[in-house]
Amino acid sequence: SLVGSEMCIRDRLITTAAQQLLAGKMTLAALRTEMTRLAKQLPEYDIVRAMYGVGETTAVQLMAEIGDVRRFPRRSSIVGFAGVDPAVDQSGKHSAKSVPTTKRGSPHLRKTLYQIVCTYLKKSPVDEPVYQFLDKKRSEGKPYFVYMTAAQNKFLRIYYARVKECLEAFDAQQDTSQR
């Protein structure tokens, strides 16, 4: 009957869609495993992984999105790259008091940074500089988006300093071992 054949087609479509979803899920898991394996070979992996709020997956995401920090001449460059720096709104004598973030750069990096800062909010680690900064901005009465973005900015500056220091030490060690 017509109803029976429609149900058979529907069942086949559902089965095919489920198989495709499962295949996609398996491919994604394989890619994540490979990315993690590659990231663990980099000298900065342990430094990034040791940062508060950064898990194994988040470390890999950060490292993949940012790449080599040595390509940024200063910390403001990496903040601008992520798009968590305030935009400039000036014209003549006019200078805006409240400006949005530039949001240039990778939205995936901004999402990862947001997830990290959310961890700070949930866990409230009082001895962590990023949380202290976030809490200070929050106690000043800043809106949620403002203090979250400021904390992302702070985290990135710390990330830049720690990873750059690690890579410079690694490079120096490589230079002395090659002599």
Question: Whereabouts are the PLM-identified features?
Answer:
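Short, small-residue-biased leader/transition segments that mark boundaries at the very start
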Residues: S1-I9
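Conserved phosphate/pyrophosphate-binding and hydrolysis machinery centered on Walker-type P-loop NTPases
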Residues: R10, I14-A18, L38-Q41, Y52, ...
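Amphipathic alpha-helical coiled-coil segments
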Residues: I14-L31, M35-L38
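Low-complexity, acidic/Ser/Thr- and charged residue-rich accessory regions of DNA metabolism proteins
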Residues: K93-K97, Y131-R179
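Short, solvent-exposed positions on alpha-helices
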Residues: L22, D46, F145-V146
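Phosphate-backbone recognition surface of nucleic-acid-processing proteins
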Residues: R49-A50, E56, Q61-E140, Y144
